[in-house]
A protein has these predicted regions:
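RNA-contacting regions in translation and RNA-metabolism proteins
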Residues: 1-218
Length: 218
């Protein structure tokens, strides 16, 4: 518990204290009754838990719109899935609702899974993390991981149209004329786009050069 104290009173405890310093005031706990001691203990524990929940919220709020790797914990009878995300002491459970799952894809507890963080909000039990497999940015983040030219800013993904589980079409453009944006995303022997297709369980990926004329995509 932090309180402000007058400098004169502080120097009665520690003669060497200066303005702005902290002073520890010893307390004789024998003067407190059992109930008061238990109450103080609960206040401290509650403060620690609130601080932990706040830190967990800040951690996952900073990961909003990121692609994370997790492990399937369980699947409810409703079809909603719970996924353990994070590493070490920063692990947390996220919800992958049935509406955010790709039709036809099934998982068992213990299976690894990549999910996209779409929302994080506070709750009395800690941060509620909502994740998705169907969001168009799942495709975007996968190509960012597989394509160095995107990570380096040489190629941009300008638009994505997606039918989750069926096909996606992405429009890309190069920042420099000597860079082939489609070839960069396809990769040598189709390795880069192939890795994305594999992660999406066979979803077809069409890659086209971006144009300001929508009719060119038809």
């Amino acid at each position: 518990l932090a309180l402000e104290i007058q400098i004169d009173a502080a120097r009665k405890i520690n003669p060497n204290v200066q303005l702005g310093d902290s002073v520890i005031i010893p307390i004789d706990i024998q003067k407190f009754g059992r109930i008061a001691a238990q109450t103080a203990k609960q206040v401290v524990i509650q403060g620690i838990r609130e601080a932990e929940r706040g830190a967990a919220y800040d951690n996952y709020a900073s990961k909003s719109q990121e692609l994370l790797t997790g492990t399937v914990l369980r699947v409810d009878p409703t079809g909603d899935m719970f996924v353990r995300i994070g590493q070490g002491g920063e692990q947390h459970d996220a919800m992958l609702r049935l509406s955010e799952q790709i039709p036809g894809q099934t998982y068992q507890p213990g299976d690894p899974i990549r999910v996209y963080v779409i929302d994080v909000h506070r709750s009395p039990r800690g941060p509620m993390v909502q994740v998705s497999r169907t969001h168009p940015n799942v495709v975007r983040r996968l190509f960012e991981l597989e394509t160095p030219e995107i990570a380096e800013g040489l190629v941009e993904i300008r638009n994505i149209a997606r039918e989750p589980g069926s096909r996606s079409k992405i429009a890309v453009r190069a920042v420099r004329e000597d860079v082939d944006p489609v070839g960069a995303c396809v990769g040598p022997r189709g390795g880069r786009v192939g890795a994305v297709v594999e992660e999406l369980h066979g979803e077809k990926i069409d890659i086209v050069v971006w144009s300001e004329e929508p009719c060119e995509y038809v």
